[in-house]
A protein has these predicted regions:
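Canonical Radical SAM [4Fe-4S] cluster-binding loop centered on the CxxxCxxC motif
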Residues: 4-52
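Structural preference for beta-strand elements that scaffold enzyme active sites
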Residues: 18-20, 68-70, 102-104, 131
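A cross-family glycoside hydrolase active-site/sugar-binding cleft signature
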Residues: 22, 72-74, 104-108, 135
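Conserved radical SAM core fold
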Residues: 28, 76-78, 111-112, 136-142
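Canonical radical SAM enzyme core domain
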Residues: 41-58, 77-123, 131
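Short Fe-S-cluster ligation motifs
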Residues: 55-77
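Flavin-dependent oxidoreductase catalytic cores
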Residues: 69-72, 81-82, 157
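Classical nucleotidyltransferase
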Residues: 118-119, 126-164
Length: 164
């Protein structure tokens, strides 16, 4: 899997400690809608990191603190290659773990856009519990606490949906 960053213990993006995996690409769809401001601009300039999915799963499962895995910015659902990398990671995780951990995908796409672009995505992942955070970053929007994620989301159009 190719990523931009990995935070092995993240306490910001979910109500429980998580492993945060920053995906490598984005089409910057939010920028035209928001005066060309990107919250992930600096991340997009970082080096690409190649890491074996099995090693990453082992690292996650050997950490007694983390309870979830987050795939996030840049854009996890940017292209089919990124989606396949996530599916591969989840497949390895599902076969290796003794208990179910939550997988979270932070996407800037709307729910309708995800359903149009990847109509079988939620079914194809075959992993529960799965949370998808939908919606774009809008600068100077009204933040709110999402009840599923248990954290503040920066834009009013953003929300999480739990698939069980």
């Amino acid at each position: 899997m190719i990523v931009r960053n990995i935070i092995f213990e993240d306490y910001i993006n979910y109500k429980e400690p998580s492993m945060y995996i920053a995906c490598p690409r984005c089409n910057f769809k939010c920028c035209p809608e928001d005066n060309k401001i990107c919250q992930n601009y600096q991340l997009s300039k970082g080096k690409l990191i190649e890491i074996d999915n099995t090693d990453l799963v082992d690292r996650f499962l050997s950490n007694n603190i983390t309870k979830a895995i987050i795939f996030a910015g840049l854009e996890p659902l940017n292209d089919l290659e990124s989606v396949r990398d996530i599916e591969n990671f989840i497949s390895i995780l599902r076969h290796a773990e003794m208990e179910k951990h939550t997988v979270i995908i932070y996407t800037g796409f709307t729910e309708d856009e995800v359903n149009d672009k990847y109509p079988e995505l939620v079914n194809d992942l075959l992993y529960r519990p799965l949370i998808i955070k939908y919606g774009r970053f809008h600068n100077n929007d009204k933040p709110h606490i999402d009840p599923i994620l248990g954290v503040k989301l920066i834009s009013a159009n953003q929300y999480a949906r739990m698939y069980e």
